[in-house]
Design a protein with these regions (language model features):
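N- or domain-start disorder-to-order transition segments that initiate the globular core
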Residues: 1-43
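Charge-rich, well-structured scaffold segments of protease-associated domains
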Residues: 1-7, 55, 69, 73-240
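Beta-sheet entry/capping signal
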Residues: 24, 35, 47, 105, ...
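Short, solvent-exposed loop/edge-beta patches enriched in aromatic
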Residues: 30-32, 43-44, 57-59, 74-76, ...
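Short, hydrophobic/aliphatic alpha-helical segments
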Residues: 41-53
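Short pre-active-site segment immediately N-terminal to the catalytic Zn-binding motif
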Residues: 51-61
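Active-site recognition of the HExxH zinc-binding catalytic motif
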Residues: 60-72
Length: 240
């Protein structure tokens, strides 16, 4: 099947990009409004990416915590760490997720088409059907939680992202850079710490965390990108 024959998508633009030696398409998914960019060429390192606009209006690190959390089990992959399990068996050339001040992206690449399909399936189910609504402990594990120190009995705060950002904020260069952005872009997503300020992260509630997913992790707010030598029509039909 040709891309032009797919009824679920509207072709907004189609042209050949000589500098990239690629046939390019910009599409819109009719049912959801999701945007799709395609670069079809002879590169066997096939790439898939889904991203969402996730502006941060505070420094609680909600987008960063959500990036971690959606990869901790989903409707079709109800295990603690499907991302890690796929890493053990996949032959991918790249598999990651990143949070920026204004977006969150989930990119992957593989030279094996079956491997790419498996990873795409896992990523799409993770972002749209995560287990975060059924299991609050995912938020507590990846974000923040109270703990009692077994030795001293003191009340402490722990969490994967919290501890990661404590490491970031222990670097003077990072603190200097953060203060520059605070000064240049006050009260915007670029002036806040998208990764989360360790002193502010505990202000994030579970309900606010879920609301952030409901608001931004929707197909209408997504951008999907496919690149390389593959059956693009088959991939688009699968995504639909």
């Amino acid at each position: 099947m040709k891309i032009e024959e797919l009824k679920a998508y509207e072709i907004k633009e189609h042209r050949f990009i000589e500098d990239l030696n690629s046939d390019s398409y910009i599409l819109r998914h009719k049912k959801t409004g999701a945007r799709v960019a395609l670069l079809l060429n002879d590169d066997n390192n096939k790439t898939f990416y889904i991203g969402f606009r996730t502006p941060n209006m505070n420094s609680t690190g909600v987008a960063h915590i959500l990036e971690h959390s959606v990869l901790c089990g989903s409707k079709l992959y109800p295990i603690k760490d499907p991302f890690g399990e796929f890493e053990k068996t996949s032959v991918n050339t790249f598999q990651n997720a990143m949070t920026y001040p204004d977006k969150t992206i989930y990119p992957l690449a593989s030279c094996n088409e079956t491997d790419l399909n498996n990873l795409m399936h896992m990523y799409l189910d993770a972002v749209f059907n995560p287990n975060i609504y059924e299991n609050e402990m995912i938020f507590r594990q990846e974000g923040w939680r109270y703990e009692i120190d077994e030795n001293t009995g003191d009340l402490t705060i722990n969490g994967v992202v919290l501890n990661e950002m404590k490491g970031v904020f222990s670097n003077p260069d990072e603190i200097f850079s953060r203060n520059i952005f605070d000064s240049l872009y006050p009260d915007t997503e670029y002036g806040f710490e998208s990764g989360g300020d360790p002193e502010v992260i505990p202000e994030l509630s579970y309900e606010e965390f879920l609301d952030f997913h409901r608001r931004y992790y929707h197909p209408s707010n997504s951008y999907i990108y496919l690149y390389g030598n593959m059956d693009m029509a088959e991939k688009l039909d699968f995504i639909d």
